[in-house]
UniProtKB/Swiss-Prot annotation:
Keywords: ATP-binding, Glycoprotein, Hydrolase, Membrane, Nucleotide-binding, Protease, Serine protease, Signal, Transmembrane, Transmembrane helix, Transport
Protein name: Serine protease/ABC transporter B family protein tagC
Compositional bias segments (type: Low complexity): 1697-1734
Species of origin: Dictyostelium discoideum (Social amoeba)
GO biological process, one term: protein processing
Transmembrane annotation, as ranges: 962-982, 1027-1047, 1072-1092, 1157-1177, 1260-1280, 1288-1308
Length: 1741
């Protein structure tokens, strides 16, 4: 379909619609600003103002003040080299003749650099993926930077550090989700100091991406810079993203010309400016940070256990614990295996204790004397092969576990771990270790800062990518706050501090196995410095003289041991497991994170002692005491080994399936993640109650740029507390058969793991859950006091919840290192209706306020002591997850009570009532008995909103959304429904045939159907389908106008409501403005709708009339013989506009009426459903009345069309035959007959008016009565305060709208009924038009569906075909031919009775009753036949032979023929004749012999169906397209039709653009030029109607000139010499002789004399060919031709003897004028007229 609006009109319409939408939005905002505020609930602290600063370690960027890169800013910094060199360095290079010129290379904008990209909102998975897709889609990779743009790190707040091109940064700034973009300053990459203490130490450079050629290129450039400083730089590749750099002097020792400080500054400033560098930091020096200790680790808060297999049944069996340290003395009995040697750099799982021992180029395969590593391994898992020896009592904690060891030192040298820590952890992980112990680390050269380094990020990264691995690291032994080892600040590790051991240890094991000699050596140096005479004292001398000189006791080992024992004896409260070791490093980290996480025993820990690289067995016979095999050491290193061993045992507990029953169950075998192990360890820790408590932050001096927070249940000294495994690690055995909820000391405990509700999920199915930004999940547990325990003393109920997640690695240069922020909140609902929230910070809060959440740590915990039965709800929320989704582990435990998983999470407290946010109003929710909120019940609505009793919500009657709902929604649903319905009908019909191939150029598709087929909706849709877009726009505009109109009464009612309380007219300002705007909208859109629909109406009637006219002129000849021209013109002129008005009006009326009806219906039911039901009680009655009305209307409309057609027919016949009317003086008779017809029209129209008026009056009376009832009942409801007076007024106005729309919709049905009569007549013509079939298969389908057969079959809608007359020379009886009023179609609609018999006009006057019966009979005939006789459409073959040239040879072979209108009469019988080119042939015979029929068959006016073929140039004309055939054939009839046009136009009619020369030449050949020249205007003379200004002979010569001008090979002449004077006959005869040259001429004549000169004459008689030959040959035969010739000759002689004029002369004066009118009459009835036939038949394609 085509859209027929110009672009200007479309722009105008679009602009107006856009204007209305903008106004709607503004109104919505205006009204929303006046609406009441409703309660808002906070979600994840969104009510706090977001901090949008970018927090880097070296800089804080305020993005509100610092300008962002804009999309119109491109700064090109061209440089030949990949390296961007600062001005000072560029100057140095220039001084060293190293040219670096700016070439203005446009590729500079494609060079990558670091940018900070801040998002407008919190980063989630979607926005992060959008950034990734943008970087991939817009990336350009250069040869000098062979890596892709990508996200490097997350930086708080809401930012990413991104490596991308400058062009990408500019493009990215236009994204709506980006708020700020800035270049990453090189100074933010540098994190090192330049002083004598640190100078010369290696510096590590973290790269953003790997590059192979980087080192050599950088070294060359930097060494050229350092020449003038007499220094060099050495770069070493650590891994693909890490370099080590050392700056050194060229000389062996520093000289005045070598300044390392200045050299380093230049080097690292230059490196920081390179796009590949990401982070630069100084290398740090690494340092190293039990028979009684297990009793503490597996004890409880107040009770210790025995170090045996009863109280500690699990010892890490099946687990591999990895340790990296100074070395391991493999010959020690704790580690040696009599069967296997220690596996060096290989894996042997069969070794009793050590499965692998990994060494590097900087380490060996042993430990130094008293080595740190051997002691750590012994504390963790060492045990002798023979467990019966006494020394086994000093075995490690996880004695059944095996060790994977990584040696970090060689001999007595310091630790040198791999620069890439992944190279340390990966081989241990591959060996099967899942728990790792690191009791070493480094402290920043800048002091105690708790900094986060690249090593720290590397540890976090390894744990993030290996989620089932956990690392435990020593906090350090530096005793101050912020003194944590750098690697221990990693977020994902378990950082372990040290607390003291049990009091017994200070009296026995510790004093016995401490290496006092190291202390003596140190103290003796101090004494020597004090007094030189003591420098050479031995320990014996110190002991001997200690009484005299007190200070000498410090170099006496015996006295040192005694001092330890004495201190423990005298101060038992200071020396026990409840105190922190004074040396243990304390938190927080530099960004305020809480470290350590846990503490474990770390003072005087006795374990394996290394004797260095020897093969002796230090254990001896295993007896005690054994100082060669055992050593007591203090430090967080020792604590870490115990914590790692405990974690290993915990992992065994889960992996072997002990949880939760305490016995091994196969389905309970759980594969824990590192975060789960960490969460369980922290969750079951106990805060120490000793003398070392957390000092308040007010008394501590912290660096000014640090942030510190307090946490409930944790401290910066001991983290979440000391490890106490027996709090929940429950194992059932023969000696200790405790149940799951009871430990050995009787404390009941329940442990729950998030996502592992044992009623629903088995442990072996467990996996971590994950969250993204904005998501949350909840875990709920119930608590009831235990019947077997009291809430006093140590039995106080307690719940602890812990949340842990493995956070992605942070950028080391960020101020805060948390990337993904999850938040844990505990909610419980009390019986008194209050709701209490707990979080990791700030304790509890009430009354719906969200608690303060932790934004720093990836560990959150909540501790609570319940006092009453309750249900806990723990909610984990993804507050900010830029690198999501984030996996997490949640652990809950409850003790001293009965705990279990809740069936469902509670939402409220019993009896609690809460204001709930409802749309556009305020509601309340009640807490039900199951602690769930009920649905929100609306209490009140905001201003400009009202409660919708149907939808049960507050609706805003004028808002942008509401307008869209009514207009857009209503329009689309309505139009889509109608179109789908019609398309469905169309689809059903298309299964039979695809009708769209019947388009004839008008854009209207009409599928041929049977003559009795009803007009369907699909048929009607085909008529309006070309205009559907315009109609849709018009309908949409009308709907907008309607929507605006139905909104006005509501505001009118509001004004009335507010009048009593209004104090000033200005109070109604907004309502008046809204009503005015609505009125303007209604006016504008109704005008547009009317304008478009008016144009569509005219377009449609034009196209429909064109379509009908095309269908008429494409009909076969029989159609015009059977139908009256007046009736056909009435269909063309009257029915098509009526049908058009009905169709376009129906669509528009349905749309607007339905919209107004539905819209008003919404309002009236919203205002009062009771009044609405009162109204709708009468709708069925109104529908019934309308149905009765439509039935009468349908019949009366058909009758009206019948009488209108008769009046038109009579009027046209009178005008055409005016000569006859005047000649016989019958004017009065015709006036009376026409008046009778008009009277019938008037009477029918009056009855139709009475019918409609009566129905309308009844409906009006019912509506008015209903209005009275509604007003009465509405007033009653208003008095009862059920609604206001204003709403009553609005309701009444809307009722008017409903009535109006109902009337419109009922009227649509009436209009549809009225259109059926017109539609039936129009579609009868449209469906009968000949059409072409495209394929042979389609022809077969048409025949099967009853549509086949070709044109000419008499399958019209007459009841009887036998009496259909054909008026022509072939009419056998010729009845009526002498009647001057005869239209040569005597079998018209009006004079055929029901039986098909002819009726004659009765001369006798009829009575009124008889006249009435006759009218009813005529009406019945009309209703049955519709006034139109239709021959079934001709189905044209699917393919033709196209002629490009024609010789003019024609041959009839056995041709027989019957006219379609008279199938019972055979006109031709087995005709055989041949016409050759260049010759003239004559056809003679009496009237009705078939002469003219032969000419019509040559022109293919009728198809042959009774046998035979007509061959032209050896081609059957049935296979030649009709128009193609007629392009070589021209026919001149006896009574030629001339158009009311100039002579030039009449002669050149057959040509598209004839020249005057061609016209004159044709006129000369036709001997018409002479008389044309004598006319006043010559060839421009207008001939009048049917050529009335010319005589008969002149008209025939003009017709012959037209045929000559057509330049066609075959000339058919039908009686062209009849009724002419001798002069005209002679001129025409000469013309024929001219035409014969090069043409095939066939003449038909009654007079044989007219054809005597023809080359051959064919004689026909009663349809048979009786003779053929030349004139002489036929005369000699004395046959039919001879008799006809002699009869004519005798008649001519008789007339001459009598002195009377011949027939030609007589007719020349009188008949020619009559012929003008008769010709016109005959042409209207299509009586074989040459020119009319050429036009009427048209192109049958």
């Amino acid at each position: 379909m085509k859209f027929h609006f110009s672009s200007n009109k479309l722009l105008l319409i679009s602009g107006l619609i856009l204007l209305v939408l903008v106004i709607g939005i503004k109104l919505d905002i205006f009204l929303s600003s006046k609406s009441t505020e409703y309660i808002k609930f906070n979600n994840n602290n969104n009510h706090f103002k977001r901090d949008k600063r970018i927090l880097l370690h070296n800089e804080i960027i305020d993005t509100n003040n610092k300008p962002s890169i804009k999309n119109n800013q491109i700064f090109i910094n061209d440089n030949d080299n990949n390296e961007n060199i600062s001005p000072i360095l560029l100057r140095i290079l220039n001084n060293n003749n190293n040219n670096n010129n700016n070439n203005g290379d446009d590729k500079s904008i494609y060079k990558k650099n670091h940018y900070i990209v801040q998002f407008k909102d919190r980063i989630n998975d979607e926005t992060r993926e959008q950034l990734k897709e943008f970087l991939i889609g817009t990336d350009i990779v250069l040869d000098e930077q062979p890596y892709q743009s990508h996200i490097v790190h997350y930086i708080p707040h809401d930012s990413f550090l991104v490596l991308m091109t400058q062009e990408q940064s500019v493009l990215l700034s236009s994204k709506e989700w980006v708020s700020w973009i800035g270049e990453f300053e090189p100074s933010n990459k540098i994190h090192l100091n330049y002083n004598e203490k640190s100078i010369g130490l290696p510096v590590y450079i973290i790269l953003s991406d790997s590059t192979n050629s980087l080192i050599q290129r950088w070294e060359n450039t930097l060494n050229s810079i350092l020449k003038s400083y007499n220094s060099k730089v050495k770069l070493t590749l650590i891994n693909q993203k890490k370099l080590k750099s050392i700056v050194y002097c060229n000389d062996e020792s520093p000289s005045p010309s070598c300044s390392l400080i200045n050299s380093e500054k230049l080097v690292y400033q230059w490196i920081s400016e390179q796009s590949e560098s990401n982070f630069i930091e100084r290398s740090e020096k690494f340092q190293t940070a039990n028979r009684l200790s297990p009793k503490v680790v597996f004890g409880t808060k107040d009770t210790l256990v025995n170090n045996d297999r009863v109280d500690i049944p699990l010892r890490g069996k099946g687990q591999i614990l990895s340790i990296a340290d100074t070395g391991l003395d493999g010959s020690h009995c704790f580690f040696s295996d009599s069967k296997y040697p220690i596996p060096l750099n290989s894996v042997n799982l069969n070794h009793r204790k050590v499965v692998t021992y990994i060494t590097t180029s900087t380490s060996d395969d042993s430990d130094k004397v008293d080595g740190h590593g051997t002691h750590i391994c012994g504390s963790a898992a060492g045990t002798p092969e023979d467990s019966s020896v006494n020394i086994s009592s000093f075995s490690g904690l996880a004695t059944d576990a095996k060790i994977a060891f990584f040696d970090l030192a060689s001999g007595s040298s310091s630790l040198t771990p791999p620069s890439d820590l992944k190279q340390l952890y990966q081989p241990l992980y591959d060996a099967g270790a899942r728990v790792h112990c690191d009791s070493w680390g480094s402290v920043s050269v800048e002091g105690y800062t708790g900094s986060y380094s690249s090593d720290t990020a590397s540890i976090d990264d390894f744990l993030f990518t290996h989620p089932d691995f956990i690392i435990l690291r020593a906090a350090g032994n530096n005793e101050q706050y912020l003194s944590l080892l750098t690697q221990s600040t990693a977020k994902n590790v378990i950082t372990v501090g040290a607390h003291q051991t049990i009091h017994e240890n200070y009296l026995t094991d510790g004093p016995n196995y401490i290496n006092y000699q190291s202390s003596v050596d140190i103290n003796q140096e101090l004494i020597c410095d004090f007094d030189s005479r003591y420098c050479n004292y031995t320990t014996a001398q110190c002991c001997l003289e200690s009484n005299a000189t007190t200070g000498l006791a410090s170099c006496c080992p015996t006295l040192l041991r005694k001092s330890v024992i004495d201190a423990a004896n005298t101060q038992p409260l200071l020396y026990n497991e409840n105190n922190i070791c004074s040396f243990s490093s304390k938190g927080p980290t530099h960004d305020g994170r809480m470290k350590p996480d846990l503490v474990a025993p770390g003072e005087y820990i006795t374990s394996a002692r290394s004797n260095g690289a020897n093969t002796t067995d230090q254990c001896g016979d295993g007896s005690l005491p054994n100082t060669n095999a055992l050593l007591a050491i203090s430090g967080t290193s020792m604590a870490t080994s115990f914590a790692a061993a405990a974690t290993t045992i915990l992992r065994q507990y889960l992996v072997d399936g002990y949880y939760p029953t305490g016995s091994i169950v196969e389905s309970n075998k759980l594969q824990p993640t590192g975060s789960l192990l960490k969460a369980l360890m922290i969750n079951n820790a106990q805060l120490l109650n000793g003398t070392f408590q957390l000092i308040t932050s007010s008394s501590i001096t912290y660096p000014s740029n640090q942030v510190f927070e307090n946490f409930a249940g944790a401290s910066l000294v001991q983290g979440w507390g000391a490890i106490r495994m027996s709090n929940w690690l429950h194992v059932v055995n023969n000696n200790n058969s405790n149940n799951n909820n009871k430990t050995s000391d009787g404390i009941t405990k329940f442990v729950g793991i998030g996502g592992l509700d044992l009623r629903l999920v088995k442990p072996n199915q467990w996996k971590e859950e994950s969250l993204s930004t904005g998501q949350n999940t909840s875990y709920c547990f119930t608590y009831k006091p235990s019947s077997s325990s009291s809430n006093s003393g140590n039995n106080i109920p307690r719940v602890v919840a812990t949340l842990v997640w493995t956070d992605p690695p942070s950028y080391a240069g960020a101020k805060f290192n948390l990337v993904n922020n999850l938040d844990l909140t505990m909610i419980y609902y009390r019986d008194n209706g209050s709701t209490i929230f707990y979080s990791n910070q700030g304790g509890s809060s009430f009354l719906g306020l969200a608690p303060t959440q932790d934004t720093l740590n990836n560990v959150e915990g909540i501790v609570h002591n319940p006092t009453e039965p309750m249900t806990y709800r723990f909610m984990v929320a993804g507050t900010n997850v830029p690198m999501g989704p984030q996996n997490f582990s949640f652990v809950f435990h409850g003790e001293n009570g009965e705990f279990e998983w809740a069936d469902k999470c509670p939402q409220c407290s019993p009896g609690q009532v809460l204001a709930c946010p409802v749309e556009n109003g305020i509601g309340t929710q009640l807490c039900t008995s199951d602690l769930q909120w009920s649905s929100c019940l609306i209490q009140s609505c905001d201003n400009n909103y009202n409660y919708n009793s149907i939808k049960k919500r507050c609706d805003k009657f004028l808002s942008y959304n509401y307008i869209i709902m009514i207009v857009a929604g209503g329009t689309m649903l309505l139009i889509i429904f109608i179109l789908l319905l019609i398309k469905y009908q169309e689809y059903k019909e298309s299964k039979k045939d695809s009708f769209r191939r019947f388009d004839d150029g008008t854009g209207i598709f009409v599928r041929p159907k049977d003559k009795d087929a009803k007009v369907s909706l699909a048929d009607l849709y085909n008529l309006i389908s070309p205009f559907i877009i315009e109609l849709a726009i018009s309908t949409a505009c009308s709907l907008v106008s309607t929507a605006a109109s139905i909104l006005q009464p509501f505001y009118i009612g509001q004004i009335i409501n507010d009048i009593p309380t209004a104090k000033h007219i200005g109070d109604f300002k907004s309502q008046f403005i809204l009503i005015f705007i609505l009125a303007v909208i209604e006016f504008v859109f109704s005008t547009i709708s009317s304008w478009i629909s008016g144009i569509v109406n005219e377009k449609m009637v034009m196209r429909l009339q064109n379509k009908v006219f095309r269908a008429l002129i494409a009909q076969d000849m029989g159609f015009f013989q059977k139908n009256n021209a007046a009736i056909l013109m009435n269909v063309l002129i009257s029915d098509t506009p009526m049908l058009r008005s009905a169709l376009t009006g129906i669509l528009l009326s349905i749309a607007t009426g339905l919209c107004k009806f539905v819209g008003s219906l919404v309002f009236i039911f919203t205002i009062s459903w009771k009044l609405s039901l009162v109204f709708f009680a009468t709708v069925p009655v109104l529908a019934f009345i309308t149905q009765i009305q439509s039935q009468f209307t349908k019949r009366l409309t058909r009758a009206l069309l019948f009488y209108n057609s008769k009046a038109s027919q009579h009027g046209q016949e009178s005008m055409v035959n005016m000569h006859v009317v005047t000649n016989y003086c019958r004017q009065d008779k015709e006036i009376i007959k026409y008046t009778d017809n008009l009277n019938n029209v008037f009477q029918t129209a009056r009855r139709l008016i009475i019918n409609n008026t009566l129905a309308s009056s009844i409906k009006w009376l019912m509506v008015e009565s209903l209005a009275f009832i509604i007003l009465y009942y509405g007033a009653y409801l208003a008095i009862q305060k059920q609604f206001t007076v204003g709403l009553l007024i609005s309701f009444c106005l809307y009722i008017g709208y409903v009535i109006d729309s109902t009337t419109t919709l009922f009227g649509v049905y009436v209009s549809y009924v009225q259109s059926q009569a017109s539609a039936t007549r129009v579609f009868m013509i449209l469906r009968s038009a000949p059409r072409k079939r495209t394929t042979l298969e389609e022809e077969e389908a048409d025949r099967n569906n009853g549509l086949g057969g070709g044109g000419g079959n008499n399958n019209n809608n007459d009841d009887d075909d036998d009496d259909d007359n054909y008026n022509g020379k072939g009419n056998d009886n010729g009845k009526g031919s002498d009647d001057p009023n005869n239209n040569n179609n005597n079998t018209t609609l009006e004079n055929i009775d029901d039986n098909g018999e002819l009726t004659t006009v009765q001369p006798v006057e009829l009575t009124k009753k008889q006249l009435k019966k006759q009218k009813e009979k005529e009406q019945k005939e009309y209703f049955k036949r519709t006034g139109i006789s239709v021959v079934e459409m001709s189905l044209i073959p699917s393919s033709y032979i196209e002629l490009t040239d024609c010789k003019g040879e024609i041959e009839f072979k056995n041709v027989s023929f019957r006219y379609p209108t008279r199938p019972d009469v055979q006109v031709l019988h087995n005709i055989n004749m041949k016409f050759e080119t260049g010759k003239c042939y004559g056809l003679v015979g009496p009237s009705g012999s078939g002469k003219s029929t032969l000419l019509e068959l040559i022109s293919k006016f009728y198809p042959l169906r009774d046998g035979g073929n007509i061959i032209m140039d050896d081609i059957d004309i049935a296979n030649i397209r009709p128009n193609n055939l007629r392009g070589f054939v021209t026919c001149v009839h006896q009574n030629p039709y001339l158009f009311d046009a100039s002579i030039k136009d009449n002669i050149g009619y057959a040509l598209d653009n004839p020249t005057i020369e061609e016209v004159i030449e044709a006129a000369k050949l036709a001997y018409a030029h002479e008389f044309i020249k004598d006319l006043p205007q010559q060839y421009d003379t207008v001939l009048g109607s049917a050529g009335s200004l010319l005589s008969g002979g002149q008209k025939k010569r003009i017709a012959i000139a037209r045929a000559i001008c057509a330049k066609r090979k075959i000339m058919l002449l039908d009686e062209i010499t009849a009724e002419l004077d001798p002069e005209s006959e002679e001129a025409i005869t000469q013309s024929i002789k001219v035409l014969t040259q090069g043409h095939t001429v066939v003449m038909v004549a009654h007079k044989v004399a007219a054809v005597r000169d023809c080359d051959k004459i064919f004689v026909l008689d009663k349809g048979y060919l009786v003779e053929e030959g030349t004139h002489d040959e036929l005369m000699e035969r004395k046959g039919k031709y001879h008799r006809m010739f002699n009869n004519e000759k005798d008649e001519e002689e008789l007339l001459n003897n009598l002195g009377l004029p011949s027939n030609n002369e007589t007719n020349n004066e009188n008949n020619n004028e009559n012929n003008n009118n008769n010709n016109n009459n005959n042409n209207n009835n299509n009586n074989n007229n040459d020119d009319n036939n050429n036009q009427v038949v048209g192109e049958q394609v």
